UniProtKB/Swiss-Prot annotation:
Reaction(s) catalysed by this chain's protein: acetate + ATP + CoA = acetyl-CoA + AMP + diphosphate
Lineage of producing organism: Bacteria, Pseudomonadati, Pseudomonadota, Gammaproteobacteria, Alteromonadales
Gene: acsA
Gene3D superfamilies: 3.30.300.30, N-terminal domain of ligase-like
Residues in the signal sequence: none
Gene Ontology MF annotations: acetate-CoA ligase activity; AMP binding; ATP binding; metal ion binding
Cofactor(s) annotated in UniProt: Mg(2+)
Sites where the protein binds CoA: R191, G192, G193, R194, T311, N335, S523, R584
Protein name from the UniProt record: Acetyl-coenzyme A synthetase
Binding site for ATP: G387, E388, P389, D411, T412, W413, W414, Q415, T416, D500, R515, R526
Protein species of origin: Shewanella sediminis (strain HAW-EB3)
GO biological process: acetyl-CoA biosynthetic process from acetate
Length: 650
């Protein structure tokens, strides 16, 4: 690894951060050698009703799979996010909210949030919700979404948040799986200037013939738009809150009692409900939030993720609020109505910590740095990236244009299933390399294995596994423990298989290469699609790229690249050939794209994830049965890509 690609921790940051390099190594070693002792100490960072005495009872044996942490202790997640701050921080701002329209703004103190949560917890009880019941939540990005989650946690109900971009069919499958009696929604949402018909989607979902469990639908008025109303079933949020008491004693929950369900997107067949429990999850979310973002009391923290994803759960609600942070919640998208919106919000709210996704960074890159000519950014101290591996070129742009080259970047790798960040730099402890998630968090033991499950040491590439449990880990697939074992523990026995491939360099840094099924086998050689994409995006005229394999008569698989050009760049055959030569120079002849299709847009979910299965089918000329496209932000993109595809049958 060349020294040019190494960004050293500055002495100022190392001196003022929670931990430096030496302390990280000491703590990490202790967490691996003596996990019980390590977590016995660090589990005390949250409040327990009945203190734990038993720390860890875990087995990755797929025939005897069980995960238990702090398992004889009791606590309440809502109390940890609210009640414990009231004595000295009741007037501290918990949530700053900015609507899709920047003129819509609210601030909510910890005292006010506590009152709202208690009221809604009592409202839920008035509608028959009891401990252990699953409550489906389909809300816009408003403070009330956090209120609902914390209210469920307060009374021991299990929330199942469904991303507001999901279709009625997706909602129905989740409601059926969880047998929800109560659904929480809003009349409409607002995102990027568009109205999202939330209540209408719920109505359509509940018309599904297999949905027979729902008794009540609680509806928040967000826009005041006209909605269908079912008497006896639908209830106004406001009428419940007007009469509810603001006193609600938090339910005493076991550490291993469920806190929430979150269904993984893109799962085939029945939805896969990832189940997280209370104690270990809260410890891990709070601890990773503090150390990875080097959070200091009084700072303003902005995670741009939607609450419908795990990032919104762990790093917009539970982790930051457990640590007493001031959290910025934004209803819209950070590049609407103009690409300058992100910078304007950072400056307006004096954001200290920003956590966003590579897809947004690339979208802003494509618009050009002149969009940030008026951006001050002096409040920013730490910046994070989440959701997919970040291309080195996007990392450098983020560092230069948003961070003004003075903010450490934490490129975090984790999953819905892991509950919290597993591999990431720590700002005061880790020299960074653009594109690398670097080193594991405390208690996390990553390894690389070959396809036979043999551990491979040193600088190498392989399948990324985790060798032992950590507190934030999911406990099961809801209602299907066999599926949990089959999906994560049978591929490589005795190890948690992440489904991702990775490289490890000579410094022990991890580089995530993408999903194992995002590997192209070209003439017997395995190529990670992320590597080819990074090379393409490094070209000055490329804003975004997605690479897939397609059937090739000679090579087995060929390389098919979908390329979105920067604003003002003209699509020419000369540029196409230039890009092929560019990739050949950057990686080698083997990685040269066979086909490069110009793409005005790529098929993405509203969280910004590229739906590669559509791209694979289009590249393979299998365009008659693409499957459900209802979760796409813009389904029309598919038709455009099909129309201009390059691999047509003769």
């Amino acid at each position: 690894m060349s020294t040019q690609s190494l960004y050293k921790v500055s002495s100022e940051i190392a001196e003022n951060a929670h931990i430096n390099e030496e302390q990280y190594k000491k703590m990490y070693q202790e967490s691996i050698v003596n996990p019980e002792g390590f977590w016995r100490e660090h589990g005390q960072r949250i409040d327990w009703i009945k203190p734990y005495t038993k720390i860890k009872k875990t087995s990755f044996d797929d025939h005897n799979l069980s995960i238990n942490w702090f398992y004889d202790g009791t606590l309440n997640a809502s109390a940890n996010c609210l009640d414990r701050h009231l004595e000295k921080d009741s007037d501290k701002v918990a949530i700053i909210w900015e609507g899709d329209d920047a003129k819509d703004q609210r601030t909510i103190t910890y005292g006010e949030l506590h009152s709202d949560v208690c009221k809604f917890a009592n409202a839920l009880r008035s509608q028959g919700v009891r401990r252990g019941d699953i409550v489906t939540v389909y809300m816009p990005m408003v403070p009330e979404a956090a209120v609902v989650m914390l209210a469920c946690a307060r009374i021991g109900a299990v929330h199942s948040v469904v991303f507001g971009g999901f279709s009625p069919d997706s909602i129905a499958s989740r409601v059926i799986d969880g047998k929800s009696k109560v659904i929480i929604t809003a009349d409409e949402g607002v995102r990027g200037g568009r109205i999202i018909p939330l209540k209408a989607n719920i109505d359509e979902a509940l018309s599904h013939p297999d949905v027979d469990c729902v008794e009540k639908v609680i509806v928040l008025e967000r826009t005041g738009g006209d909605v269908n109303w079912v008497e006896g079933r639908d209830i106004k949020w406001e009428s419940l809150m007007d009469t509810a008491s603001e006193h609600c004693i938090p339910e005493e929950m076991g550490a291993e009692d469920p806190l929430f369900l979150l269904y993984t997107s893109g799962s085939t067949g029945n939805p896969k409900g990832v189940l997280h429990t209370t104690g270990g999850y809260m410890v891990y979310a709070a601890m990773t939030h503090e150390y990875v973002f080097d959070y200091k009391d009084g700072e303003v923290y902005w995670c741009t993720a939607d609450v419908g994803w795990i990032t919104g759960h762990s790093y917009m609600v539970y982790g930051p609020l457990a640590n007493g942070a001031t959290v910025l919640i934004h209803e819209g998208v950070p590049n609407y109505p103009t690409p300058a919106r992100l910078g304007e919000m950072v400056d307006r709210h004096k954001v200290n910590i920003l956590y966003t996704a590579p897809t947004l960074i690339r979208a802003l890159m494509a618009e050009g740095k002149e969009q940030f000519a008026d951006f001050d950014g002096s409040s920013l101290r730490i910046m994070g990236s989440v959701g997919e591996p970040i291309n080195p070129e996007a990392w450098r742009w983020y560092n230069e244009v948003i961070g003004h080259e003075h903010c450490p970047i934490v490129d975090t790798w984790w999953q819905t299933e892991t509950g919290g960040i597993l591999i990431s730099p720590l700002p005061g402890a880790t020299d960074t390399k653009p594109g690398s998630a670097t080193r594991p968090f405390f208690g996390v033991q990553p390894a690389l294995v070959d396809n036979m499950g043999n551990i491979i040491d040193g600088a190498t590439e392989g399948n990324l596994v985790i060798l032992d449990s950590w507190p934030g880990q999911m406990r099961t697939v809801f209602g299907d423990h066999d599926r949990f074992a089959l999906t994560y523990f049978k591929t490589f026995r005795g190890m948690y298989f992440t489904g991702d491939g990775a490289k490890r360099d000579e410094d022990g840094y991890y580089w995530i290469t993408g999903r194992v099924d995002d590997v192209i086998n070209v003439s017997g050689h395995r190529l990670g699609t992320a590597e080819v994409e990074s090379a393409l995006v490094a070209h000055e005229h490329v804003a975004e790229a997605a690479v897939v394999g397609y059937p090739h008569d000679i090579k087995g698989q060929g390389i098919y690249a979908y390329v979105t050009l920067t604003k003002g760049t003209i699509e020419t055959e000369e540029l196409r050939q230039e890009l092929r030569k560019w990739v050949r120079k950057e990686i080698g002849a083997l990685a040269t794209p066979d086909l490069i299709q110009w793409a005005g847009g790529l098929p993405k979910t509203r969280s910004g994830k590229i739906m590669r299965r559509f791209l694979r089918k289009i590249a393979a000329n299998e365009v008659t049965n693409l499957g459900d496209s209802s979760t796409l932000a813009d389904p029309a993109v598919i038709d455009t890509l099909i129309e201009s595809r390059l691999n047509r049958s003769e």
